[in-house]
Structures are given as structure tokens and as C-alpha cells.
Amino acid sequence: MRDYEFKEIEKKWQERWSKDNIFKTENQVEGKENYYVLSMLPYPSGKLHVGHARNYTIGDVISRYKRMKGYNVLQPMGWDSFGLPAENAAIQNGTHPAIWTKSNIENMRRQLKLMGFSYDWEREIASYTPEYYKWNQWLFKRMYEKGLIYKKKSLVNWCPDCQTVLANEQVEDGMCWRHSKTHVIQKELEQWFFKITDYADELLEGHEEIKDGWPEKVLTMQKNWIGKSFGTELKLKVVETGEDLPIFTTRIDTIYGVSYAVVAPEHPIVEKILKDNPSIKDKVTEMKNTDIIERGAEGREKNGIDSGWHIENPVNKEIVPLWIADYVLMNYGTGAVMGVPAHDERDFVFAGKYNLPVKQVITSKKSDEKVQLPYIEEGVMINSGEFNGLSSKDALVKIAEYVEEKGYGKRTYKYRLKDWGISRQRYWGTPIPALYCEKCGEVLEKDENLPVLLPDDIEFSGNGNPLETSNKFKEATCPCCGGKARRDTDTMDTFVDSSWYFLRYCDPKNLNLPFSKEIVDKWTPVDQYIGGVEHAVMHLLYARFFHKVLRDLGLLSSNEPFKRLLTQGMVLGPSYYSEKENKYLLQKAAIIKGDKAYSQSGEELQVKVEKMSKSKNNGVDPEEMLDKYGADTTRLFIMFAAPPEKELEWNENGLAGAYRFLTRVWRLVFENSELVKNANDEIDYNKLSKEDKTLLIKLNQTIKKVTDAIENNYHFNTAIAANMELINEVQTYVSSSMNSEQAAKILGYTLKKIIIMLSPFVPHFCDEIWEELGEKGYLFNEKWPEYDEKMLSSDETTIAVQVNGKVRGSFEIAKDSEQALVEKTALKLPNVAKHLEGMNVVKIIVIPNKIVNIVVKPQ
């Protein structure tokens, strides 16, 4: 018998698949429905990590399964290949980003092929190529023409390490998302913005269309990020100048409790205040220089400056002080808020710190209940003029109406979502196709001159904007008047690249348009998208925005980009921390003894199971696993260890277990292959033995269980476990029933169905066995098995027989047999009869189709 030589087998089938180009996908196949499976495209860092392997294995299993279910499946792959790491490599190593990126792509493509993924490589894209980023520029122009792009001076998030602007979504706890120890600062720059806020309502309303296919957690994260708040915009009067100071509040019911007002240090009125009160200028400057993310953080102490100015409350005409405070941000609402310390926890703390008045205007509905401030529950209005006695819920409406009637303000809503700033002061991105001409002003490059190419004469020093160092790039000709012009030296945020890439896969060779509407409408929305939940408010929100814009531009028809979204769980691994060395050690440097680990010097290490990361030294190189166990074993372990949406704890013992299972199946097939090959599949169902029936029922139950597990919730681990149980049943059958031509037919029939069901998980292994069993072609093209309803359960049942509650035997009998026959059969069992000797039968209790309990006592 041949050994399971996985390296030889996997190489053989990868070469055959490639030679026959079996994964090539046509845009339409007669009689087949299109199905688009897509995993988020990777950044080409140079090496696959285990997270990649998990994501792409999930996608490949779905893709192969859907093909076998009769769909015309598109599963492409490409590279999100612009971005800072390539530029940083150029700075550190003197390697041009294009060379570094191309080399990394080649290695990662090789690794993906080693995993046996069924990608249509003819559709491969890479966002760093002019063939791709030309269309970023073309789409920029179309959005500009539609009024969805503008440029303005703006306070932006600036990473001192990246030397570039970050979107709000790229700032995490005040730190750069790429440099976790770098504080983001505020800087005022001219920036290009996409008007994503124009689509805020539609982005919220669109959740209704995708709610059945997307995780609720992702929809909630997007809803909170968009942050639509209903309230009232109220015009407070600045006493010193008579001008209006608009504020936005969701709690107009507390307007009578205002004891101060607050503005952000960046608010335009602050400049006027400083002219009148220059003594506070240094404090204001210090406040403005504080990290804006930190300023808005929950739990941080709030700091304020008394401006010396006052405002008049239009509702009760009270004069209250105007303060400047760091917790008020210009990028939300109007940059000014009212202070109601009796009914807001933050305001209460601020008022206490600066000894500001506290005025209660809502009390408990229970008149005898003593209220502790701040009181933030619903209640009854007090100290609120004509609104006294109303419930605070009713007052919210009545006071808003009153404010509108009097002309003091209006009911409106605000968003937390801000327009998407896309300008980046780096080289390795899509050049913005804008120019500045003294005569014509701001103009965009002509379509026929696209793409605006990245220049080669760049100095990668790590300081400032690299494109500013290229005169060849900056000096240009105005496309309108032919005069001298200067190119915009910013590049686009790389999230632009990934906001529409899934559409380019549909029509990747199109030279005239980013894609054909006719072709894209055949494939989109993407049927199944797979990626991490960390992309909820960046990539996934931007892609939804882009899709709606492209629909409105007439470039496609669907409203949403992704019908279903699967967010796979993180991959965890053991980490080993040395307090003595103050660092994480590699697993191979740790000495494992039972559930403890020690360093080479004998120090006991802190062992945790954590998300795999470079900083924790607990990552696993998938290629090492491929070399040791093979792609199929690695794929099987990944899919068996946990449901896809749950965390997966990497465990080499689990890999070894998956390998043992495959070798067991291998032996089972090869030990019986000659028998199976010589038998046809024509089973005589009228001549089935008890063992034949048992196996065929188990087979049909397994087909149903596997199909349901994949179709209903992608619980691939359940599907694999069901096949493992069936293999156990087959081994029992082989050891007891291989004594007829019928048995050989049933064995062959069952093994082939198992191999088909395992093939999405372990494709090389299964194609090899398929060939060994005398079958032609690729399993990729086989039809997924269907179960026979009539063979899901036996027409017989097993009855357990108890004597005084203890099991003494069992027998099989037709279901729903008459009770007299059941009792008679039970009493005849030899071991039961033995335990009835010398006993009187008191009564016999029969639970139909399950148990017979014979109650006895001594004679």
C-alpha cells in the first residue's frame, strides 16, 4: 500500500490544476447562477500569516462547495499594495517601493498556491499598478464633477512618525493605528475630502437591506460611528457682542437648568475673546495643542478656562458665564455646548471643579423620593416656568416647539460621522489628479492624460512629503490653458483603493472603463464577503459609500456591495513572557514542562494564550506547517478547530490529529481500493442486510448534516466531525460485512460520497483518492451529494430491556410494534431470562420504541 506522501501529492495536483486552468471563471455560464465569494485582499507584507490562512481557507471551502452545488463561482485574489510599509522599506533599505512590493507579491502568491486555493489568477489585480490606480483617478474626477469632493483647510490628525494625515478611523485611543506608541497631534492643512456625510442617512437605511446577512455587531458599530443624533439647535446670545452662539442639544428639556456655556478652544469666537482678554491666550494655546482624541476620551479630567464673557439664555433670559473647555470638540455639533450640571454627569463634575452653579429642573415622578444629583432619569419638570409639572419626556417636545415658535432655534439632527479626508503626504499611493494654474486656478487632469504617474526621481528621507522633492512631477502643463501649472503633491488614502476593488475583479482587463456595468451587474452584490471585524468602520463603511456613489453615477445597479459578511475570529497562540529579560520569547526558546514553561536559564515564564502578533513573538509561519504537515492537514485543522466566527487557538497537537485522520482515511481507501474499483454503484436496495442499511442510513444522515452545517451557518467543524463519525461507521462495516459483491458496491458508493464531501476542505488529498478509485476528472466539477429522505432513519428501533431498572439486554424490532410482541421479545432474551429466575414479574413498563422495564420481586 502507498504511503500518504502529501508533498508529492499536493505538488502533483497544483500543477495539474494550473495546467488545465480549472479555476478560470466565465462571466456567465448557461444554466448556472453566478455566485461571488470574496476574502478581503491582503497587504503584500511578504509572508502569509495564520490569520490570512484562516480567512482564505474559509473562502476557498465556500467557493468549492458552491461550485459543486451547481453555481458559476467567482473567487479572485489581488493585492492592496499601496501604503506606508513599502515606503518605510525604501527609507530603511534603499529599495524602491515598487521593487519591494513586487517581490512580496510574488512570494505571497506562491504561498497562496501552495495552500491549494481555487483562485482565478487571470483576474489578479494590484492597486500599485498604473493599470489600477488610473481608475482611482478617473473615479476621483467623476466624484469631483458630481460635487462629492472638495478641498478646505482643516484640523487633521497628524502622525509624527508616518508624517501624514490619518482619518478619524485610523486613530485608536489617541495613537496612530500603525504606530501604537505614537501620539496623534492636530495640524491645520489643506485637505481633499469625500462628502461621505451626503450619504449618512442612506448608509444607515441600507442596514435594513443587509441585516439578515451581516453580523449585528458590525451594523451596530457602523450605526454608532455615523452617530445620528436628533435634537435642537439653539441660538444663545453673546452678551458682549450681541452675536448668536449656536449650540446643539439632545436635551432641550433641561434648558432652564443651564448655568454656563462652553466652547471648544478652536471655536471662531475664541479669537475675539482673546483680543478682549489676552491674559488667557497661553492657556488656550496649550489646550489647543492637546491631542484631540485624548481630549474627548471618557474618564479623562475636563479642563476649562473662564473666558470673561457671558451668554444670555433666550428661554428665561438668564445671563450665565461662557467658558472654554478641552472636552468640547469642533468636529462635533457646533463646537459649543450648554452646561446643565444638575442633569449631566460630565457637566456636574466640571461645575464642581470650577464652583459653578447647579440648578435642578427635573425631579422624580415620586414626590416623596429624595433626588441625588446629577439626576439623569426621566421625571417631572420643576423650575421651568410654564413647563412645570410636565413629564420630562413631554417637555422635550413642548419646549422644542416653543423654541421654534419664538425663533430661538430649530429641531434638527447632527452626525458624528465627518467627511472622509483622503489627502496623504506620502509617495506610495495614488497621485491626486489635480493641478494649480495661476490663470485657471484649481483644475483636474484630462481623462486622456490619466494615469498621472508616480515619478521615479524621489528622495526617500523619511521627512516630509516625498513628492515635493520631484520637480519633474510638480512642474506640469495646465490641461485647460496650456500654461505652467503645479501638480498636487498629495496622494490618496489607501482605503480608496480597497473601496471598489471587488468591482474591478469582475472586469479586470477593461482598458476603457474601471469596469463594465453589464458585467458588474452579473456578479454584484458580492454574495459572500469574508474579513475581520476590525474593518467595520473603515473599509466596510467606505466600500458601502463608494458603491452608492457609483450607483448614482450610473456605473452599476445594486445598492450594497456585500450581501453577506462573515467576520472570522482571531487566531490565538501561547505567548511566553520573561520578566527578567522584559520581553516575549519564541516558543522554541521556552522549555515546556506540563502546564508550565521555563527559560533556558530556569526562570518560570508567564504563559498566556493571546492574539498572534510579532510583538508577542507567538506567531506561526504557515509555510512551516505546510512543510511539516501539508496544505490539506493545515486546511482541515483550521476548519475543524473552531466555528469561523469564533477565536481559533492554534495548537500543533490539533494539526497532528488532523493528519492522523487523513492517514486513517487514506489507509481505509487503499486497503479496499481494488475491491471498490471492480464494483459498480448499482446497489440492490431490495437485498440490503442489516449492516448495509445501517451504513446507508448513516451516510444519508451525514450528507444532510454536512450540507445543513455549511448552508445554514458555515459550521464547518460540525461538517468535518460528521464525516469523521461516518468514517468510523465505514470501518465497522469493513471489518464485519465485506463478504459480498453488494457490500463492495455499498462501500465504494459510501467512500466516494465521503471524498466528495471532504474535497472542499482537503482538495489535493481527495483528488488523489478520486483518481485511485478509478474516477475521471476533478472533484471540483462533481455534483454535491443529495440525501434520500427515505434513508434518513431505519424502520427498526433498538429497545433496551431493564430488570428492576438495570439494563440486561437489547433487541431490534419494527418501530411501533404491538406492546404484546415487544414484551414477548424482551422476556425471551437469554440474559433477561437469567435475571428472572426465581422471581415473580410484578409488572412490565413499556416506553414505546425505547425501553422495556420488567419489575420483579423474589418468589
UniProtKB/Swiss-Prot annotation:
PROSITE patterns: AA_TRNA_LIGASE_I. A motif ('HIGH' region) lies at residues 42-52. It comes from the Bacteria. The keyword Cytoplasm applies. GO terms for molecular function: aminoacyl-tRNA deacylase activity; ATP binding; leucine-tRNA ligase activity. Its EC number is 6.1.1.4. GO terms for cellular component: cytosol. It catalyses: tRNA(Leu) + L-leucine + ATP = L-leucyl-tRNA(Leu) + AMP + diphosphate. It is an enzyme of class 6 (ligase). One of its GO terms (biological process) is leucyl-tRNA aminoacylation. It is found in: Cytoplasm. This is Leucine--tRNA ligase. It comes from Fusobacterium nucleatum subsp. nucleatum (strain ATCC 25586 / DSM 15643 / BCRC 10681 / CIP 101130 / JCM 8532 / KCTC 2640 / LMG 13131 / VPI 4355). The gene is leuS.
